Design a protein with these regions (language model features):
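A structural signal for the principal folded core domain
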Residues: 1-155
Length: 155
């Protein structure tokens, strides 16, 4: 699970034990001083990955909107690769809130959708001062929701 790039490895889980938070994610000791890491709510099952990748492969976008999403999705590895910055932006603000409807935990869907909405709002050409203060409150609430389901090492 920990490939060196993840913030959800054994060290992060041991930190959770020391902090006495998220007991459902604490590592479970097995034989020979090894540990098993329980699946977190943000881990997608292969079926959920397949549904999301199938949805993304089926998207057709107008010329110039973004790259062909079909070329970025690998059904073999159930992953998204080779995205340029604009493609990531479009994926985050437009496609992700729709694609995650297939995942189970409702609170996680809500937090991710709120995050996508925030990025969509701050990427607009003009933002009013009152809108900025509303967005500040909104992003603080969203961060609190994300802190409830993601490990502390993520932040």
């Amino acid at each position: 699970m920990d490939t060196g790039k993840s913030k959800d490895g054994l060290k992060a889980r041991k930190d959770m034990v020391q902090l006495n938070v998220m007991s459902q994610l604490h590592p479970v000791p097995t034989a020979n001083r090894k540990y098993t890491l329980p699946a977190a709510c943000f881990n997608l099952t292969p079926d959920e990955k397949r549904v999301i990748c199938t949805f993304l492969r089926g998207i057709k976008v107008p010329t110039g909107f973004s790259a062909s999403v079909k070329k970025l999705v690998s059904m073999k590895n159930l992953s998204i690769t080779h995205c340029k910055a604009h493609d990531c932006h479009v994926m985050l603000t437009v496609f992700l809130p729709i694609a995650i409807r297939a995942i189970k935990p409702e609170f996680l869907k809500m937090a991710i959708t709120r995050m996508c909405y925030f990025f969509s709002k701050i990427s607009q050409k003009t933002i009013g001062k009152e809108e900025l203060s509303d967005l500040h409150e909104f992003v603080v609430e969203t961060q609190n929701q994300l802190e409830m389901c993601l490990p502390p090492a993520f932040f």
